[in-house]
Amino acid sequence: MRTPNRLLGLVIGLGLVVLGVLRLLLDSGAGFFAPRGTLLFGALEGNAALGILHILLGAALAMAALSSVRYAATVNAAIGALLLLLGLAGLFLVGTDANVLAVNVADNALHFGAAAVLLAAGLGLDRPEPATS
């Protein structure tokens, strides 16, 4: 568990699971895909669909972190790319009826930040040294 990929995957994964569970517990009942959700910590907005997405992504990161370093790096990069796409989509969805995950600017910042860390870890850390002859 002492490799950066495994540690970062576990920490971010557990954080996403906690956020997802809190979103489900504090859901206002506005609707699963409602464009307006409940505020979490006074800043993060989201609905039950975003809560479940965070739980699934977080669980995948945590399970990969408990596996091998190579698998953790691959999953970190893949989920980092998904979070980057979610952040980019969120830029266009905020304030529209198409915002089925009820993301706001703070959610987008969270997704971009997690994506940057996961992509950097998954693509740049824990790589084997090149063979020398």
Label every model-predicted segment:
Residues 1-133:
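Membrane-interface extramembranous regions
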